[in-house]
Curated annotation (Swiss-Prot):
The lineage of its organism: Eukaryota, Fungi, Dikarya, Ascomycota, Saccharomycotina. One of its GO terms (biological process) is fungal-type cell wall organization. InterPro entries: PigQ/GPI1 (IPR007720). This is Phosphatidylinositol N-acetylglucosaminyltransferase subunit GPI1. Keywords: Glycosyltransferase, GPI-anchor biosynthesis, Membrane, Transferase, Transmembrane, Transmembrane helix. It comes from Saccharomyces cerevisiae (strain ATCC 204508 / S288c).
Length: 609
């Protein structure tokens, strides 16, 4: 089995012009490969003993082009040093833009996750992949290990530009020690705690166990989302600003020079997803308010036209069209002969509901003065808190106005569903069968003649009444699906505003190394080389992985509302509901499942301060 030696390009280029003999010094632990940290001249090592985990892996004679390796069957792997300052790092697995506790819930199948976990624990997979992962951890902390080596052996040339003290760092350290800075930090601490406490209290009230308002209102859910984001900001900031990770590497190497398990817990890249999620959320909030300012200005200029047009459209859709459809259903629509008595009864019932709802609240809500006041409120809301709040308020307003359609759909679907169940039971009776509820099966049964006659008469009556009930049911089902489509489309717009991976896309275009999607190792051996040479490269994350929550959201929408299962529900008369909480759960992937309490929040802020 070859011994892999990871060489940084910077070290190769810095020492390629040197003519004298050289010695390459590397670090390696029990579960890692060799990683070259620097080179020096041999005379510096004559009076110094190199202690583990450091060792000499190669030497170079005076004027020689190649290296003489001290290990058997060496294999060189060249890599470029990741810049910790710019949050570049290597990762064998694609970086996750989702909180780990939400990963299992977003998988299409929990069984797939369990199978992958079992495969990951296989000895062969664990042996090969673990060694490479631990080596990548050393590479990611390469400047820190170089600093630790340079402090122990100052004569060794290492590449540690990222850790050299600068004047800016000195000025920042001096400013942080002044009284003014401490006073401002104290004020910021208490101000942050008060804001987060209010947000946490509001979120707790909206998610009260006995009556969760977030399940019934899009506007309330938007408030809850923003409150949870505000509460989670300090936690994300505290995670991404830990500076003890790099500084303690040298002491940890001295304490435990045979094991590298500590390196994973000291990896700064562990919290890079929080960095991306934090600034992505901040950018989206700023863009949300920007869109609100732009669209609010447009709405102000066209307010009179929008009010009059909205009044006409809403009156036609919620009153005139409903009344026309209901009256048409009572008069044999499309030449289909319906049961006159049942059609007139249902038509008069629905017409009474239409008139009652219109005179009670719809007429007042769609009045031009009311619409003008509501539009003004929406515009001010756009200016203050963003476009998403205005859209969510419009969704709730539309849901209130379309409540009569929901009532008609529920009544007709219940009638249709009950009629189908009764007809199925009577058909079993006609065939001499009976449903066994305990065993959930159809058994043969003997019925009396009068039972068969009565069942047959009822079955025939229901068969002749089915076209009438179906006509009302299908008409209001179409209207209900139209309202659901409008609500879902508006919810998708809100989801796009709140959770679009804008910051991640910009990072992907600007610096793909900050969003690793795995690694690739390519062969670089030339004819003059005696040993195999490989090149370690960072593969950027795929765009498909960045939009994975949206793919799951679209899949849920298609499955629940626009699939064969939806058609089957309509045929059976089952209710089609908008489960906003289940639909929107996918897009809460950047937030913890349980909102932070005030006590936990205070602990986080205290640690950060």
């Amino acid at each position: 089995m070859p011994n892999y030696i990871f060489w940084p390009y910077e070290s190769l280029f810095e020492n390629s012009a040197a003519q004298g003999p050289q010695v390459a010094l590397a670090i390696s632990f029990e579960k890692t490969h060799f990683v070259v940290l620097g080179v020096c001249e041999p005379q510096y090592l004559e009076e110094v003993s190199i202690r583990p985990p450091y060792s000499v892996v190669a030497t170079k004679n005076n004027g020689a082009e190649g290296w003489n390796y001290k290990v058997a069957d060496p294999c060189n792997v060249h890599f470029r040093i990741p810049k910790l300052k710019f949050m570049q790092f290597y990762s064998s697995d694609p970086i996750s833009l989702i909180i780990p506790e939400k990963e299992v819930g977003l998988h299409s199948s929990v069984g797939e996750t369990l199978n992958y976990s079992k495969l990951e624990q296989h000895p062969r997979y664990k042996r090969d992949n673990k060694k490479l992962s631990e080596t990548l951890n050393i590479i990611n902390l390469f400047p820190a290990y170089c600093k630790a080596l340079n402090e122990l052996y100052p004569f060794i040339q290492t590449s540690q530009e990222n850790l050299r003290g600068t004047m800016l760092n000195s000025v920042a350290a001096w400013c942080s020690s002044t009284c003014i800075y401490k006073m401002v930090a104290k004020i910021g601490f208490y101000l942050t705690f008060v804001i987060c406490s209010i947000a946490s209290l509001v979120s707790s009230l909206l998610n009260y166990s006995h009556f969760q308002l977030v399940n019934y209102s899009a506007f309330v859910q938007q408030i809850d989302l923003r409150c949870q984001q505000i509460c989670y900001f300090p936690v994300q900031y505290e995670r991404i600003n830990k500076k003890d990770n790099i500084q303690n590497v040298g002491s940890m190497v001295e304490k435990d020079n045979s094991n590298s398990q500590f390196s994973h817990s000291y990896m700064p890249s562990k919290f890079y997803p929080d960095y991306i999620l934090l600034y992505n959320t901040i950018w989206l909030i700023i863009n949300d308010i920007s869109f609100g300012l732009i669209l609010g200005a447009i709405l102000i200029e066209n307010r009179d036209f929008l009010v009059s047009a909205s009044h006409r459209v809403l009156k036609f859709f919620l009153y005139d069209s409903l009344k026309t459809i209901t009256e048409t259903l009572a008069n044999n629509p499309l030449g289909i002969k319906l049961n006159a008595e049942l059609a007139n009864f249902l038509s008069e019932l629905f017409l009474w509901v239409i008139e009652f709802s219109y005179t009670t609240f719809i007429k007042r809500l769609i009045d031009p003065k009311t619409l003008s006041s509501l539009l003004t409120l929406t515009i001010y809301m756009m200016f203050l808190v963003g476009f998403s709040f205005a859209v969510s308020l419009a969704i709730d307003f539309f849901a209130i106005l379309s409540f009569p359609i929901y009532v008609f759909y529920r009544i007709s679907s219940k009638l249709y569903h009950c009629q189908l169940n009764i007809m199925a039971s009577l058909f079993n009776l006609f065939c001499g069968k009976k449903r066994n509820v305990l065993r959930n099966r159809i058994d043969h049964n003997y019925f009396q003649l009068d039972q068969l006659l009565l069942g047959t008469l009822l079955f025939i009556i229901l068969v002749f009444l089915t076209p009438t009930v179906m006509a009302f049911y299908m008409s209001y089902t179409v209207l209900r699906m139209l309202t659901i489509t409008i609500e879902i489309f508006s919810e998708a717009v809100i989801a796009l505003i709140n959770h679009f991976p804008l910051f991640a896309l910009l990072l992907r275009l600007k610096d793909p190394k900050r969003l690793p999607g795995g690694i690739s190792i390519e062969l670089k051996t030339t004819v003059s080389n005696k040993h195999t040479t490989l090149e370690l490269q960072n593969n950027p994350i795929k765009f498909k992985s960045m939009f994975r929550p949206y793919n799951l959201l679209l899949s849920q929408m298609r499955t629940n509302y626009f699939s064969f299962a939806t058609v089957r529900k309509i045929v059976r008369g089952e209710s089609i509901m908008v489960n906003r909480n289940k639909l929107y759960y996918v897009l809460y992937s950047s937030l913890p499942s349980k909102p932070l309490s005030v006590k936990d929040l205070y602990k986080r802020l205290t640690i950060q301060a």
